[in-house]
Amino acid sequence: MPVIVPTNEEVLSYAGLHLFHSGVSNCSMRVRMVLEEKGLEWESHHLNILKKEHITPEYFGINPAGLVPTLVNDGVVIIESDDIIDHLDDAFPEPPLKPSDPQQREQMYFWLRKAV
């Protein structure tokens, strides 16, 4: 899982779930769907990528690639939607979103990769 150490140290003090995302990003939508499916409370940090809000020095300090989504969970920064989804399902196991059967889980990951 791409857990990164941000240079924007402000996010290290964030408590709870904070999602940096964009309404026009499919990858952001996937993470928002998981947050809602699990019934988790989270704080929205919407970035307008059409106005290039994701390529500012402040955001590069959170995600050096300047991509959305980025999740901050109690100061831990996680990038890449598949890894964020895995983190959420592991950290908040109910309701489970991943099959317990290894073959079914591999098939799920196959379709997740196709859906990007």
Model-derived segments and their meaning:
Residues 1-116:
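GST-like domain detector, emphasizing the conserved glutathione-binding G-site
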